[in-house]
Amino acid sequence: MSAVPFTRVLLISGFLAHLLLSTFVTLTVCKEVTEESDDLSKRNVLQRQLWAVGSLMGKKSLENTNRRSDEDMEISALFRGSPLKVKRSD
């Protein structure tokens, strides 16, 4: 029966100790992160802005729009050089 050198036993046991320690550290960090995200999700549900819900979205911006008259559109077409037909009274 051959004997295993003592340095090799220390090397293997040291590797296993580091592996166990790193596993423990990562598990505790992951658990803390998930606990914080659970608390944040509970808080965000209560801070919901009600003006941006469903059928109310965009209503504020549609009430105050100004419609341009036909005369204004003809004048702007002249300045832009648009190919729109413009009635001229001579």
Swiss-Prot record:
Residue ranges of the propeptide: 31-48, 61-90
What InterPro entries does this protein map onto?
Answer: Bombesin (IPR000874)
The UniProt entry's GO biological process terms, in alphabetical order, are:
defense response; neuropeptide signaling pathway
Task: Give the modified residues of type Pyrrolidone carboxylic acid.
Answer: Q49
Q: Which family does the UniProt entry place this protein in?
A: Belongs to the bombesin/neuromedin-B/ranatensin family.
UniProt cross-references to Pfam families, sorted A to Z: Bombesin (PF02044)
- Cellular component GO terms, alphabetical: extracellular region
Q: What is this protein called?
A: [Leu8]-phyllolitorin
Q: Which UniProt keywords apply?
A: Amidation, Amphibian defense peptide, Cleavage on pair of basic residues, Pyrrolidone carboxylic acid, Secreted, Signal
Membrane-crossing residue ranges in chain numbering = none
